[in-house]
């Protein structure tokens, strides 16, 4: 159990590169390629029908092994880029006697990490006191890796997250024209879409808050925008079609260490975390009905993620769409119960389990369309359960926090990996101060104790169609950066707070744009 309680970035014994598979390489040569994967992408991951011989080998009929292999390759590749920064930089800085050090250092950095820094960055880092210079260069290198990841993500679409047609069809058949998901800001939930639920990132609007304490008013404004787009443009469907908006909240818990590795925002109290998320869903639904009438009702869904193994509690709504904490199914139990069933029987068993869950507690069953959708999502989660079983021996070695950086602002679609980033949606530091404080507290344990800086990436999205939108987003990003350094001066002064302001046009698939920030201004002054 001591191994499970570790919260630093420790690689599992099963953390290894994927052995080349000729068949897989032919269809998807790299984790970042733009090769067409056909039915291999995010269509629920269950298109290939398993034979009886496959089931005899212990493979669940609803698990997509090829997709798991592909996702693992991406995860290992991206995380290694961030995890090796410290050791590579220390090796380089230990050899400052090299002739033409800056040029040599950049060559070494690119050869080992695939990124390079500007000559000004290297000169500034070398001029600073040893530890502060290392912290400066660490931040610059990590930010360069993020920009590289962002470009790869939006240009090459390595997770096929822009291919959302099949998933959209599933939700529309269930009566939903749009999906919003509100997970906790905890980095152990950052992969909720692409991995846990196996959904394309472009399908759902994701905005994370510590403890799932999302802003109800902001969520209502987004709902109004979606409904207006339906009315004016007929997108994603016509306003007179009988479909609704689906709002999903995701809290989290840990069965291995419930009193320490649960939700920090709720004191690792699982019931409080679930109750708070449910109350936010109720408030959101009530706000829309109060403002726009009962005919404008939305559907809500509550999920609980076990961050030890990525299995879930799926809280089953009744016939009226009401959610209750006591009505839920556990995907790990359903995974085991359906292990030896063929594809069609396993799917039917899931639908039966959803219906009987409510009946056992004297409640009504969900609408048939919702039963089918929930069954599909649970089946998707089976692939993630198998993923953790295969590559993490059934339980993550880093069951606690092990994030590499903090992301604040909006967007961050390119962050789709578990424990890569602590991400919190905010408009201003003042409004999101509680979320940011939680992130800073986490990184004091992860980084500061080891002499590493806390890297914070700021993202402000803009609408490229709107005149002045980019300028306003830039001013906002720089304002947030300044507010961070003012609030956390005890970290900023010794170089333990490194920040990168970025922008992105959310109307396109273009990557993040780097802005010159406070660190760049200071570096320019030092080298002038």
Curated annotation (Swiss-Prot):
EC identifiers of the protein: 4.2.1.1
Required cofactor names: Zn(2+)
Binding annotation for Zn(2+): 184, 252, 263
A biological-process GO annotation: carbon fixation
SS bonds (residue pairs): none
Location relative to the cell: Carboxysome
Record keywords, A-Z: Bacterial microcompartment, Carbon dioxide fixation, Carboxysome, Lyase, Metal-binding, Zinc
A Gene Ontology molecular function term of the record: carbonate dehydratase activity
Stretches for region Disordered: 17-47
EC supergroup of this enzyme: lyase
Positions of the catalytic residues: 186
Catalytic activity: hydrogencarbonate + H(+) = CO2 + H2O
Swiss-Prot/TrEMBL induction comment: Induced by growth in low levels of dissolved inorganic carbon (DIC) (at protein level).
UniProt note on regulation of activity: Inhibited by ethoxyzolamide and dithiothreitol (in crude extracts upon expression in E.coli).
UniProt-listed Gene3D superfamilies: Carboxysome Shell Carbonic Anhydrase, C-terminal domain, Carboxysome Shell Carbonic Anhydrase, N-terminal helical domain
Loss of function: phenotype: Cells do not grow in low DIC levels. Cells lose carboxysomes when grown under low DIC conditions. Accumulates intracellular DIC normally, poor CO(2) fixation.
Location, primary (coarse class): other
Co-factor: note: Binds 1 Zn(2+) per monomer.
Subunit comment: Homodimer.
Family named by the database record: Belongs to the beta-class carbonic anhydrase family. CsoSCA subfamily.
NCBIfam families in the cross-refs: shell_carb_anhy
Role summary: Reversible hydration of carbon dioxide. This bacteria encodes at least 3 CA enzymes. Essential for chemolithotrophic carbon dioxide fixation, supplies CO(2) to RuBisCO (ribulose bisphosphate carboxylase, cbbL-cbbS) in the carboxysome.
Protein name: Carboxysome shell carbonic anhydrase
